[in-house]
Amino acid sequence: MKLKEIDRTAMQAWSPAQQHPIYLATGTSAQQLDASFSTNASLEIFELDLSDPSLDMKSCATFSSAHRYHKLIWGPHSMTAGERVSGVLIAGGENGNVILYDPAKIIAGDTEVIIAQKDKHTGPVRALDVNMFQTNLVASGANESEIYIWDLNNFATPMTPGAKTQPLEDISCIAWNRQVQHILASASPSGRATVWDLRKNEPIIKVSDHNNRMHCSGLAWHPDVATQMVLASEDDRLPVIQMWDLRFTSSPLRVLESHTRGILAIAWSMADSELLLSCGKDAKILCSNPNTGEVLYELPTNMQWCFDIQWCPRNPAILSAASFDGRLRIYSIMGGSTDGLRQKHVDQLSSSFGNLDPFGTGQPLPPLQLPQQTAPQSVVLPLKKPPKWIRRPVGASFSFGGKLVTFENAKPQQQPGIDQQPQHHYVYVSQVVTEKEFLARSTQLQEAVQSEGFVSYCQKKVDMAQADFERNVWSFLKVNFEEDSRAKYLELLGYRKDDLKNKITSALNLNKECCADGELGEAPTESDVPLLNKGDEGQTAEEHFLGERAKDSKQETEDLGSERKTFNISVSGDVDGLITQALLTGNFESAVDLCLHDNRMADAIILAIAGGQELLSRTQEKYFSKIQSKITRLITAVVTKNWKEIVLSCDLQNWREALAAVLTYARPDEFAALCDLLGNRLESEGDSLLRTQACLCYICAGNVEKLVACWSKVQDGNSPLSLQDLIEKVVILRKAVQLTQAVDPNAVGALLAEKMSQYANLLAAQGSIAAALTFLPANTDQPDIVLLRDRLCRAQGELPAGQEAIKAPYERQPMPKDRAGPVAGQVPGPQASAQQYYQQGDKPPPPGFIMPGAINPSAPPQQATSPSYNMYSQAGTRPAYPQTYQTTQQYSFGTGETALYQPQQPVAAPASASYPSPASNTNPPYLPAAQPVPSPLYPGQPQPSPTSLNPASSFPPPPSGASFQHGRPGLPATSVAYALPTGPTGTLPAASDLPASQRTGPQNGWNDPPALNRAAKKKKVPDNFMPPVPITSPIMNPLADPQAQMQQPPAAPVGTPSFQPQQLSTGQQAPLGPYAPQALGPCVVPPTTFKPRTEGAPGAPIGNAIQALPTEKITKKPIPEEHLILKTTFEALIQRCLLSASDPQTKRKLDDANKRLEFLYDKLREQTLSPAIVSGLHNIVKSIETRNYVEGLNIHMHIVSTSNFSETSAFMPVLKVVLIQANKLGV
């Protein structure tokens, strides 16, 4: 778009790249006059200020000159650093003089601005250029083949590059080589260019166009390649730009023909060698890629010619153009908006006229009434592709899954004599792993879960633990997978049964000894202690005690039996008497109250037991209310089983004792709640140390959610290893809970889901996509987790189970593959598209859908197997991506015959109207009058209607060698061959024998014999008459071609109808084309003869080369199932290319490739290819599916270079053609 504008008819020169700010010098042109016809000349310097939105450029200085200029350049000689203007302005005058100006003095306003000047040339100096390696060297060219090399340090005596070229002519262009400093080129209007070597002082190469119509108006060296240059032609009869390589000067390397009239000036960008500016008499300014000839940008200009065009050295996106209308314009190739330009025009009009009548009446103008117009496009588009200076030389970006995507723009290597091929840009995808320890621990956890080695895993963690708390946690987790877990928990809390028993025994022995010491001073009475036998002295205290009880019981029994003693029942008024009276009357409650009143607690408890459970409970309460000791609360809880009170009221320092009591006495239904209650107290009321112990309570309770919450509070969860610590404990605890409690294994709380999502993100960032998907919660509707699951599934190439794909911001409509248009004259009925996507789910597929792997129609559809393990034990599986199927119907022939269930491959649009090879079958060649309807292939599938069986779709297709073309030569083949059955002789049935709905198009081919008159007298046909094979192409197929061998079993007996059209209702038409159902029977064609093709011109007499060979029935084997994808992928790719190709030559190549790939399919049927070739072909298919055709070509080259030529020579060349065309067409 246009940035600035100067109203001058002048030559131009940009300040060097080192100069800042940017200046533009203009000198009055010697070739034109301005609108005022002034003969004055001047030299001006303007400053480029892009921050100023106006179109005007600021004029810094003006120098009135006595010369007009043919060429003006600004050299970097004697440049100084900083913002001071420096360098030297070099001008070529009209009188043969070369003048050096000091731009700093011009801006300063000095009068003596000329550094030096010489008039050695005869005639105007039209060509000037500065050597970019030695900036003190300047080349100039003028009339009579004069070329001088000036040294700015010694400007007095110039040198010549050699003898003048003959014949003498004007020098219109001159340019120094951009790579070699001693090479100079000059060109003349006659079309000849001369390359000079200053070291030899002679011309080394002369380049000229053979048609002698080149009038050179521009010359430029390639910025990167030393041997290439371009020449522009001013001749309207040959408005071209020729690109030459000096190593091959016989003809141009490339010719750019974008202009319609002569080219006046060219300029090659030093910042990007793919940008070449050109302006011509067609009033166009074009920016082209000289390496490919493509026009990248056309500047919006007016209808005026431009005679000079230049790039800005400092800002490569800016250029200037001087036109014959007296304006010098500054443009940008990066696009922009033109609203400011239109506003400037409006402002200029307003400032000129104001709001008054311009005709002197002094009256204000009425408002201008204009019809409403649509606003023009105000945005100017930039280049088609970014220039090199804004392209990143390298780039890197992290993608999902921890992959680092990098690229680099390598400099292309120029090869002599070879057209520059499109540069291949490579993108490198690397897996970046930053947390190796994290991944190693995650792998160990997954292995433990998969092998269910939880005990050994926990024991390993216990051994590796350095902190006591970490060791306790893993010890508690380990107990969950062992028997008698509560006893093991007690042991971990310090309560071992064996140790406690030993302590009690020791305490009893100590008490016994104390009692024995007291008996030495006081003899026991007979009533207090029974006599001990001497033999009992060695017994233990317990045995002694039990023995005494037995003896007492025995003695009492003997006493009752031998002699009954009497006792007194006192009913006095004291406490004993009252108790006696209460007992005699059965009033246990009063008796207990009396005992409690008299502080006889043991008697009260014993009587309460006799009085029943209710009385015992009340007595226990009264007892506990009166008796206060250190263990009373504990005894109370033991007796009343009120452990919630203990958990809520115990001292938190005794949390271990409280947890031990819960482990010993709590019922299974209250155990988890009591552990949670104790954990909540520790977490909310305790200090930092006690808060960490709450995790042990939650582990005992199996409360994963609270364990996550507590751990998140007491631990640093910001590092990956800290999160790994938590996930290890969570996963192990969840597995323990699933084993010991009847809980939903998929139930996940919000906090746990968040942690699992973070963990899955970390795993995915390290490249463990499968593991991340395993740890991700399965049954949550949180948007972040749903999105992450979708991304993980897509990264693995599948869709989440029970979830539809998340829709993109825009809908991408897939183009149906393998779909041919209907034949002229046909009206296709309602058909399903050739490509439909089905996904296994609850809904049955449409009729005719063949489930993958379903051989028995009654068998249920197979589903993809789930992974061997899953952190959530999710039920169901994730189905794979929906597969592509061709909607088809499979039919059975004959009553009671079962249908053949074979998935039909997608029907490719015929490229040459060749029939596909029919499937092998032994069904009769005729259609029975009544056909059974096949059973549904899927439960709930509707039965197909009988009307779907039509004569066009019921007969098998002819063999692939029988190619019939109806129409003029060159017309594309149609799909009629897929719908029409064969006649008795292997040809199409006559038009009169077909139903009216099937008579399509002209029936005579390009080389068919004239049609016989129906009224002609019929001749008797002999019985052994052999009808000839119709000619179907200009040249017969060779005998060795497997495609030319037709399957021809013996002819049907006379009287057997080979074609019985089914009666159709009025207005009904048989569906034709490649979407009609096809029968699986073979084509019945009588034997015939073949005419082999011989070498020679088409149509030449063949002579005695005709042979009558009997044909045999040849049945091709099916392609193995694992290699069928090769055929479908290659055919689908060819069809996409055919749809995108526009030129006939490309289509012919693709048609030929489609035929010759049959050699590959035959080798696949015979399984004669080596495994390396087959594996390489499958890799090519993968690259085609990802549209990475460059990778496919690399694989192709590897296969060809490493395999036997005889194996691949039949099909690999055409496969390369297909890949190249696909890459070129971008399908």
From Swiss-Prot:
Q: Which domain of life is it from?
A: Eukaryota
Gene behind this chain?
SEC31A
Q: Which PROSITE patterns match?
A: WD_REPEATS_2, WD_REPEATS_REGION
As for membrane topology, the entry says: Peripheral membrane protein
Subcellular location(s) per record: Cytoplasm; Cytoplasmic vesicle, COPII-coated vesicle membrane; Endoplasmic reticulum membrane
Q: Which GO terms describe its biological process?
A: COPII-coated vesicle cargo loading; endoplasmic reticulum organization; protein transport
Q: Which InterPro entries match?
A: Sec16_Sec23-bd (IPR024298), SEC31-like (IPR040251), WD40/YVTN_repeat-like_dom_sf (IPR015943), WD40_repeat_dom_sf (IPR036322), WD40_rpt (IPR001680)
Q: Which GO terms describe its cellular component?
A: COPII vesicle coat; COPII-coated ER to Golgi transport vesicle; endoplasmic reticulum exit site; endoplasmic reticulum membrane
Bias class Pro residues marks the residues at: 925-945
Compositional bias annotation for Polar residues: 995-1006, 1057-1069
Going by the UniProt record, its keywords in alphabetical order are: Cytoplasm, Cytoplasmic vesicle, Endoplasmic reticulum, ER-Golgi transport, Membrane, Protein transport, Repeat, Transport, WD repeat
Which positions does the entry assign to WD repeats?
4-47, 64-111, 120-160, 166-206, 209-254, 258-298, 301-342, 397-430
- Quaternary state and interactors: COPII is composed of at least 5 proteins: the SEC23/24 complex, the SEC13/31 complex and SAR1. SEC13 and SEC31 make a 2:2 tetramer that forms the edge element of the COPII outer coat. The tetramer self-assembles in multiple copies to form the complete polyhedral cage. Interacts (via WD 8) with SEC13.
Cross-referenced PANTHER family: PROTEIN TRANSPORT PROTEIN SEC31A, SEC31-RELATED PROTEIN
* Compositionally biased region (Low complexity): 905-924, 1040-1049
What is the role of this chain? Component of the coat protein complex II (COPII) which promotes the formation of transport vesicles from the endoplasmic reticulum (ER). The coat has two main functions, the physical deformation of the endoplasmic reticulum membrane into vesicles and the selection of cargo molecules.
One Gene Ontology molecular-function label: structural molecule activity
Residue numbers spanned by region Disordered:
804-875, 905-1008, 1040-1075
Major location (coarse): cytoplasm
Family that this chain belongs to: Belongs to the WD repeat SEC31 family.
What's the protein here called? Protein transport protein Sec31A
